[in-house]
C-alpha cells in the first residue's frame, strides 16, 4: 500500500480564514473529525495510523467512524488476524481504532513505545511456509 492522501495536511489556517473546512477520508478519519472538531489532537492522527495499519492487513479501510458510532461492525484486528501477526501489533491496532479518543494512545510517543515494546506473549507466529517446512522436516527426517 502507498499513502497518497496528504491533501488535508496541506490545508493551513490563515488570519483571513479562521475556520478550517472539514477534510477527511472515510475509513481513515477519527470520529471527532465528523462531529466534535474541538476535540482534535494527536489521538486523531493515531486513529488514522491505526486505520492505515488495519487497511494494510485487510486490503481495504475499516468501516467509517461515523457508521461505527451508529452500528459498530468493525471486526477487531485481534479477532481477524490472531495467529497471523503478533498479538502486540494486533492489540496496538485495536487500541488506535477505539471510538472514544480518551481510550486511544494520547501521543505518538506512547504509540511508538507500544510498537517497539518487546512481545511478552512469545515469538511471532510462524508463516505458512515456515510451518510447512517444519512439518515436512519432522515427517521426512
Regions found by a protein language model. Name each.
Residues 17-27:
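Activation loop
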Residues 12-16:
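Conserved catalytic-core motifs of eukaryotic protein kinase domains, centered on the activation segment
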Amino acid at each position: 500500500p502507498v499513502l497518497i492522501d496528504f491533501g488535508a495536511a496541506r490545508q493551513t489556517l490563515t488570519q483571513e480564514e479562521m475556520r478550517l473546512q472539514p477534510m477527511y477520508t472515510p475509513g481513515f478519519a477519527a470520529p471527532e473529525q465528523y462531529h466534535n472538531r474541538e476535540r482534535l489532537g494527536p489521538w486523531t492522527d493515531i486513529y488514522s495510523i491505526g486505520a492505515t495499519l488495519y487497511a494494510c492487513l485487510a486490503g481495504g479501510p475499516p468501516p467509517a467512524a461515523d457508521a461505527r458510532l451508529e452500528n459498530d461492525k468493525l471486526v477487531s484486528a485481534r479477532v481477524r488476524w490472531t495467529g497471523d501477526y503478533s498479538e502486540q501489533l494486533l492489540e496496538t491496532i485495536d487500541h488506535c481504532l477505539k471510538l472514544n479518543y480518551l481510550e486511544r494512545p494520547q501521543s505518538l510517543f506512547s504509540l511508538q513505545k507500544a510498537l517497539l515494546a518487546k512481545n511478552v506473549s512469545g515469538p511471532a507466529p510462524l508463516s505458512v511456509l515456515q510451518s510447512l517446512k517444519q512439518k515436512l522436516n519432522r515427517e521426512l527426517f
